[in-house]
């Protein structure tokens, strides 16, 4: 059993307990954040909060993909909505987590989870992790004249 799963199944883990499992340079990829995050000090509070936020449920699957990579599936409910997470965890030679990538479904439950996490962590994380920046005109947004030209060519 992966140490993160074992810790979460034992109850609500503390920040210190979560921190002990993480490599200093851990990378976290989550659909509730606009970009990957890196570093134990930034990520440990997120993992701790998510254990308290995500509601009741159980791990239903665990597979070792190779000697350092684990797949976990968790199913539960949050505010009465079915909630499912799938994650891939990569550990280093010392058994510390170096990368964690999560997928969450369905969308309504993901949104509830994201909103709850935002409320709990908005002042603890940089603002740019919550929203994608608005595209500039140079990044693919069409100007009015270009739109008219495209429509005229159809």
Regions found by a protein language model. Give the residues of each.
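C-terminal and inter-domain tail/linker signature
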Residues: 1-154
């Amino acid at each position: 059993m992966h140490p993160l799963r074992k810790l979460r199944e034992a109850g609500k883990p503390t920040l210190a307990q979560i921190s002990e499992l993480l490599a200093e340079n851990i990378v976290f990829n989550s659909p509730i954040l606009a970009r990957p995050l890196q570093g134990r000090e930034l990520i440990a509070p997120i993992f701790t909060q998510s254990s308290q936020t995500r509601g009741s449920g159980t791990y239903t699957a665990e597979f070792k993909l190779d000697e350092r990579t684990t797949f976990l599936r968790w199913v539960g409910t949050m505010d009465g909505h079915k909630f499912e997470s799938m994650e891939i965890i990569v550990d280093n030679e010392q058994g510390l987590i170096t990368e964690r990538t999560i997928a969450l479904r369905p969308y309504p439950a993901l949104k509830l989870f994201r909103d709850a996490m935002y409320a709990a962590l908005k002042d603890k994380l940089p603002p740019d992790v919550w929203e994608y920046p608005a595209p500039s005109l140079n990044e693919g947004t069409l100007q009015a004249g270009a739109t008219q030209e495209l429509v005229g060519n159809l």
